Amino acid sequence: MAIERTLSIVKPDAVAKNVIGKIYDRFESAGLKIVAAKMKQLSRAEAEGFYAVHKERPFFKDLVDFMVSGPVMIQALEGENAVLKNRELMGATDPKKAEAGTIRADFAESIDANAVHGSDSVENAAIEVAYFFAASEISSR
């Protein structure tokens, strides 16, 4: 099994609900280690840059507006098959379609306010982790 790193963001809706610790418990219980973390109020430029891949999609403006609506908790997770494991923990993008017991089923309100972001591939994970963390801010353990 490959040790991977992935990016996770606890979005403004979940931060406002004060469930960061409950979400972190899901990561750690699944064998993922938090190797970097910071709370941050994203600027519009940061959110637009991070989600640039969606720039031409109709939901882009609403997504950016949501991501700058309050602080987010950003973390790099590390572990065996971290990308897939985190995606399984998150559940489907639409919380109404997410399996019971997943983060989105338990903490998300809607497809827009869906509690968490997670990298969708090992390649994107490397890009996303580097977007928010310098190598010196990451401590493998």
Swiss-Prot record:
Gene that encodes it: ndk
Primary site of residence: cytoplasm
Source organism (scientific name): Chromobacterium violaceum (strain ATCC 12472 / DSM 30191 / JCM 1249 / CCUG 213 / NBRC 12614 / NCIMB 9131 / NCTC 9757 / MK)
EC code: 2.7.4.6
Pfam families: NDK
HAMAP family for this protein: NDP_kinase
Cellular component, GO annotation: cytoplasm
BP term (GO), one: UTP biosynthetic process
Keywords: ATP-binding, Cytoplasm, Kinase, Magnesium, Metal-binding, Nucleotide metabolism, Nucleotide-binding, Phosphoprotein, Transferase
Residues the record marks as active site: 117
Protein name: Nucleoside diphosphate kinase
Residues annotated to bind ATP: 11, 59, 87, 93, 104, 114
Keyword ATP-binding attributed: yes
A single GO molecular function term of this UniProt record: nucleoside diphosphate kinase activity
Top EC class, one word: transferase
Family from the record: Belongs to the NDK family.
Cofactor(s) the protein needs: Mg(2+)
Subunit structure: Homotetramer.
